[in-house]
Amino acid sequence: MSSMWSEYTIGGVKIYFPYKAYPSQLAMMNSILRGLNSKQHCLLESPTGSGKSLALLCSALAWQQSLSGKPADEGVSEKAEVQLSCCCACHSKDFTNNDMNQGTSRHFNYPSTPPSERNGTSSTCQDSPEKTTLAAKLSAKKQASIYRDENDDFQVEKKRIRPLETTQQIRKRHCFGTEVHNLDAKVDSGKTVKLNSPLEKINSFSPQKPPGHCSRCCCSTKQGNSQESSNTIKKDHTGKSKIPKIYFGTRTHKQIAQITRELRRTAYSGVPMTILSSRDHTCVHPEVVGNFNRNEKCMELLDGKNGKSCYFYHGVHKISDQHTLQTFQGMCKAWDIEELVSLGKKLKACPYYTARELIQDADIIFCPYNYLLDAQIRESMDLNLKEQVVILDEAHNIEDCARESASYSVTEVQLRFARDELDSMVNNNIRKKDHEPLRAVCCSLINWLEANAEYLVERDYESACKIWSGNEMLLTLHKMGITTATFPILQGHFSAVLQKEEKISPIYGKEEAREVPVISASTQIMLKGLFMVLDYLFRQNSRFADDYKIAIQQTYSWTNQIDISDKNGLLVLPKNKKRSRQKTAVHVLNFWCLNPAVAFSDINGKVQTIVLTSGTLSPMKSFSSELGVTFTIQLEANHIIKNSQVWVGTIGSGPKGRNLCATFQNTETFEFQDEVGALLLSVCQTVSQGILCFLPSYKLLEKLKERWLSTGLWHNLELVKTVIVEPQGGEKTNFDELLQVYYDAIKYKGEKDGALLVAVCRGKVSEGLDFSDDNARAVITIGIPFPNVKDLQVELKRQYNDHHSKLRGLLPGRQWYEIQAYRALNQALGRCIRHRNDWGALILVDDRFRNNPSRYISGLSKWVRQQIQHHSTFESALESLAEFSKKHQKVLNVSIKDRTNIQDNESTLEVTSLKYSTSPYLLEAASHLSPENFVEDEAKICVQELQCPKIITKNSPLPSSIISRKEKNDPVFLEEAGKAEKIVISRSTSPTFNKQTKRVSWSSFNSLGQYFTGKIPKATPELGSSENSASSPPRFKTEKMESKTVLPFTDKCESSNLTVNTSFGSCPQSETIISSLKIDATLTRKNHSEHPLCSEEALDPDIELSLVSEEDKQSTSNRDFETEAEDESIYFTPELYDPEDTDEEKNDLAETDRGNRLANNSDCILAKDLFEIRTIKEVDSAREVKAEDCIDTKLNGILHIEESKIDDIDGNVKTTWINELELGKTHEIEIKNFKPSPSKNKGMFPGFK
C-alpha cells in the first residue's frame, strides 16, 4: 500500500486511513471492529465534525476485505482482469440456423452452472438459489425484440402466434417482480397462463430469424460477463456466502451523497457499491418525472396496459453489473446517485432498477435507513438482511422511524375506492374467488368506521377521535371474520390477484391472448399497507398486539362543491360565478405502533451486527430498551476541538432584565416576545457573519414574526443582517433556493453583516445540513423543544411507557418525553462546529438551564455539557460573547492565509493545484487541516507552494491599495484606495412562501366468514387481556485551476482583502516575499468612518503584512488537496463557471447592452445571476470601492467586474476600475439586461431591503 495512507492495525485488521486519525476516530474504529469480530451490536456517539463517517467506512470495509484476504486497492483490478465470454445465444456453440428454421423456442441463458455458484453472493438470492438476474432476462428479451424504434421511449410489445401446446409444453416465464409486464405466451384456447409464478424459470422466446449482430446483446456494452467469476471468489465449497454485505443506512439522500464523497477519498473507493433510492430521485422517464405519484405511474407503465412498456426499463442490462459499471462506464470510484441518473439518461437505462440489480455484486449498499426498517420496502427491494452487517448513521431518530415503519393509516375514501374497484372485478367475473374475500375486508372496515363515527370524542377544535387497544381490535377483526386462521388465506388471495395472467380466447377465427386485468396501483399499495400491519397484529400468537393502538380520527377539510347537472344532463355555470366551497368530514383509521422493537424484530436476531451512530445519541440509555436490542459495545467520544474554539452559555434573562422561561404560557405574552427579539438583535450586532436561531415550533415562529413586524424590531434586524425564515412545508427546490440566498448573503455581504436564519427544531434546517465556518458563527436556541404534549400519539406513547416501564425496562413516560426534546436540541446545536478548525458560539436561552441544571443539562451532548457556563445577567453574557467573537474574528481575518500552508487532514490525494473561494468557503477548503502546522502570525502571511507558483507581485512595497477578493477562476484585479467609492447594493423585499375525495355509494355486501366455510374453526379464540400480555414481556429476538491566495486584512468588517494570483508553471520552486505592505493611516480612518456597521477597532495603520511562500518540507502526500468540487456542494454553491469571454464578445455585449443602468435594478436581492458589469469608463480618484460588494460569480453571481490586465511581472498593472453608482454621478456603465428570478424572492419577509 502506498505511503499516502496512514496504516493502523486494530483487532488484527489492517486499516488504511486517508490521514492521521483523531483519537475519537481510533476509538470508534476499535469499537466497530470489536462488534464485527464478536458479532455484537454497537451504539456509538461521536460529535459532528469529528470524522465519524470516515471511521465507519474505513473500519467496516477493511474488516470486510480482510475476510477475503485481498488488499483494499486490488479489489477492482482483480475483477477487471477476469476475461468473461459472452453467454448470449448468438455466441453459443449449439446455436444453428437449423434451430431457428425449425421454429423451436430457445433459452437465452448463462452456461450451466450450479445455482449456488451463480447467485451465491447475492443477499437477495440466498433463499431462492435458482433466481435469475434482471439483467440476464432483459438481455435475452432484447435479443428477441427485432423491430424496435431506438428513438422511442416506449416499445410496443409484438404479439406472436404460437402453435397450440400441451400442458407439458407450456413454458412459464418469470416476471421480474410484481410490477413487470412480460411478453405473451400462447396455450390451449381458453386457458390462463400465469406470468409470475414462483416456479417459473427465465423467459423463453422463439424469434422468427437469427438475432442480429452482437450490438443487440450485452456484448454491445462490453458487458458479457457472467456473475459466477466474482461470486466464486467469495464462496467456499458449500456454496454459502462467507463475506457479509454492508448495508449503510442514513437519514436522507443528501447525507448519502456526503457519505459517498467521503468514501471516494479513502483507499476503499473502488469497492463495488450501489445506492438504493426512490423513484423520486432516480426515475428518468419523461411521463413519470412530472407525475405527482411516481410509484403508481411507474407501475402502470411497467404493466403495459396500453400495449407500451417503459423503454428505460428494458435497457437495464446495459449497466446492471459492477464490472461493466467500473470498467467500461468509468465509474471506478465511489459514485453518487446523480452520476448513475446521468449515465442512465445517456444509455437509456433505468437508474432505479439498475441500482437494485447492482445489489447482487455490491459489497456495500447505501440507502435511507427506513429502507431497512420498513417491511414493505424490504419486500419491494427484495432485501434479505440475514447474516449481513447493518450500519445506521445519524440514528438519533431511529426510534421514531421504527415506530412509523410498523404503523399504517388509511382514509375512508381510500377504502371506498378499493372496495368499488374490487366489486367491479367480482361483477365482471375476473378472478372472482380471489377478489371477493378482499372486497369483504374493505366492506367490513368501512361499515365499522361508519358505525363508530357517531361515538367519537371531541379533543380539539373540529377534531374528534376514539381509541382501541390492539387486543380490542383483534376481537373486532374476529367478528369480521379476520382471524389468525383466516388471515394467511387472505394473504394468499391477495398474492393471487397481484399475479399477471393472460387468457387465451378465439377472436374472429384467430387466437388472441388478452391480459387479465389487475387492481390499480393505488389499491395495491393500500392493501399492502393494511396487510402489513395485520401481519404484525397476528404474528406469533398476537405477540405484538399490546404494542398497538387503533384510532379513528375525524377532521374537516374544505373542498370545492361539485356541480350537478339538471334532469336533462345539462350543466349551466354563470360566467362570473365563484365556485362554492364546503366543509367535509374526513375519517382516518390509524394503526399506531408504540413500540419500535416491533419493526426491529425483523432485523434483530437475523443480522450479524447492528451499528448505530450519531453525533447526538445522548441520552443513550433509552435505545436498548426501546429497540429491544442489546448494545454490548457503547461509546461516547470526545470532540476534537479545543475548549477555546467554542462558547457555550445559558442566558436566563433579556436585555431589559425580564426572566426568559419559554413555557407555553410565557411565550404567549408580548413581554416575552419583545425580550427575545431584543436579545436576538443584540447578538446579531455582536456576532458577525451567519447566525442560526432555532425555535421550538412553527407556531411560535409565526407569533414572533408577527409581533416583531408590528413593533419594528424585524426592521431593525434587517438593518443588521439579511433575515430569512425556514418555511413550513413547501417544495424542496424552494427551500434550496431560499438556503442559497442565506449562503449568498454571507458570502457576498454588502452593507449588512451576514445573515440570520430563523428555523425550527426538528425542521429541515436542523437535520443533516452543514453550516460550517462563517455560515454559523452562532447558534441560538430559544426554549426547550418538547413535543406537543396535546398530540394524541405523544400522549399514547407516554401512557404506554408508564404502563410497561417496570416489566420491559422502558423509560417512564416523562423521561421519554424529555429525551425527545434533548435529541432535537442537540441536533440544532450540532449545526455549529463542523470541523477541527471551526469556531462558534452556542447560546441556550431559557432560565430552566440555570435554575435546575441537574435535570435540564444532563440531556445535552457530552462535549456541550463539559463547557457550558451559566450567566446570571444578559450583560455579562453579552460581554463574554463579544470578547470571544472579537478574538476569533481578529484571528480569522489575519489567519485565513495561514490555512493555505496547512496539511489537509482529511485528504492526501496528490493534485496539481489549489482552489480557494471567498471567506466562508476558504475555511471549508482547509476545514480539516492539521493544527500542528497552524501559525497564528499577524505580521506574516505564509503561502505554501505546490509545484511551482509564480507570484506576479514584486518584493517592492505596493502603494496603498485595496486588493479585492475574487472567485476561484476569475482573474485578479487591483484597486487603488483613493480612486473609487463604495458601492451600496440594497436588497429588495421578497415575498413569503405561499402553500398550496370522492364518495361512492354502496348498497350491500356479504359477510367475510362465508369465504372460509369449512376451512377454519368458527369459535372465537381466546385473547389475553392487556394486563395478561403485559405480564409476560416479549422476547426480542483533477482539473487544473488557478490558485488564489486570499489575504484579508484585520478590519472586523473585512471591507478589503488581498488577492494574489498564483499560477503554476514548470520552473523550480522559489520563495517570494511581499513585504512592508502598509496601509495609509489617514485613508484607513476615512474608510472606517464610511462603514456604519464597523466596530470601533479600525485597521491599525502600522500593521505590516508580508507574503511568504516557502518550500514544502513535508511529503507531497501530506499536503495535497483534493480537487473535486463536490466538497462545496453541501453549501449549494456553484460548481461550474462559465469560460471567460473573448475581447470581441465583450465588445459585442458592450454595444448591445449600452445605456442600461445599475440603479434601475437596485432593489434586487444580492444573489446570483442578476447582472454583469462590462465596462466602466470614468474614474473618480477620490473614492474607494468596497471590493467585497462586487465579487464576481459568473455562473450565478452578482457583480462581474472586468478583469485586471497584468502585462508584466515588474508591477505594471493596468486595471479597470469600478466607479460610483450613486447620487447622480456621471459614470457610464454597461450592464447585462436581466430579469430577477421570482424563485430567489421566496421566503423573504416584507421590509427586507
Swiss-Prot record:
Localization: Nucleus; Cytoplasm
Mutation effect (S986A): Does not affect the interaction with BRCA1
Biased composition (Basic and acidic residues): 1110-1122
GO BP of this protein: chiasma assembly; DNA damage checkpoint signaling; DNA repair; double-strand break repair; double-strand break repair involved in meiotic recombination; homologous recombination; meiotic DNA double-strand break processing involved in reciprocal meiotic recombination; nucleotide-excision repair
Resulting phenotype, A349P: In FANCJ; destabilizes iron-sulfur-binding and abolishes helicase activity
Chain positions covered by the region annotation Interaction with BRCA1: 888-1063
Domain Helicase ATP-binding: residue ranges: 11-442
Protein family (similarity comment): Belongs to the DEAD box helicase family. DEAH subfamily.
Protein name: Fanconi anemia group J protein
Species the sequence originates in: Homo sapiens
Primary gene name: BRIP1
